[in-house]
Amino acid sequence: MGDSVSVLHPKVLLVSAGFTTSLFVGFNLYRRYCRRIRTYLDLTPSILDNQRQLYGKVTRVGDGDNFRFYHTPGGIFLGWGWLRKVPETRSALKDETLMIRLCGVDAPERSHWGKPAQPFSEEALQWLRNYVMGRYVTITPYSIDQYKRVVARAQVWKWTGRKDVSAEMIRTGIGVVYESKVGAEFGDNESWYRSLQNRAKLLRRGVWSLGKKMTTPGQFKKTYYRGE
């Protein structure tokens, strides 16, 4: 009995404190870096306010300025791509992805709900598919819009470095700077996006090749009483 150690012994208290601290730190590290963001409901105000970046794979491109994103926290370091696979079927991906609405850019409207298609709408869709479909991208979520889409900046690695997807759309003229004041998000890039648009317009790239016949997506949606 003489060798027994009280639970109040300094060494016991120190070990207990260290163990508790390790659990607390580990839990917070898991929540911040390892927990999957499955849907927009998992995006906490802290994530949006701090503009925390998320890494994942583009699983579907359904329009010229949005896509489905499967979050893969930790990337290759946590086994994604070799130990852990991203689902491929629509049923397996149900309720497991974020719908991303690219920030700061508006693509020409495709034909739906009885509305005619804008020129370059299919080109914009094909461009985005070629640029990001099946690739891993980094998103910076800014907000959630009225359609439950995550308005975000998206960046993807290319041979020439990391590219801002919105900027590249504007640069090539298959997207224009977002015009609506409702839900507009640019991060810190609005002036950059506008300078890229001015150059695309000067060089008559993409939609700007239409000259006076060109109607922006924002103007087009106003004509058909549908705002986004």
Curated annotation (Swiss-Prot):
The chain crosses the membrane at residues 13-30. One of its GO terms (molecular function) is endonuclease activity. Pfam families: SNase. Its EC number is 3.1.-.-. It is an enzyme of class 3 (hydrolase). Residues 52-210 form the TNase-like domain. Ca(2+) binds at D106. The active site is at R101, E109, R149. It comes from Meyerozyma guilliermondii (strain ATCC 6260 / CBS 566 / DSM 6381 / JCM 1539 / NBRC 10279 / NRRL Y-324). Keywords: Calcium, Endonuclease, Hydrolase, Membrane, Metal-binding, Mitochondrion, Nuclease, Transmembrane, Transmembrane helix. GO terms for cellular component: membrane; mitochondrion. This is Probable endonuclease LCL3. It is a single-pass membrane protein. It comes from the Eukaryota. It is found in: Mitochondrion; Membrane. Gene3D superfamilies: 2.40.50.90. Belongs to the LCL3 family.
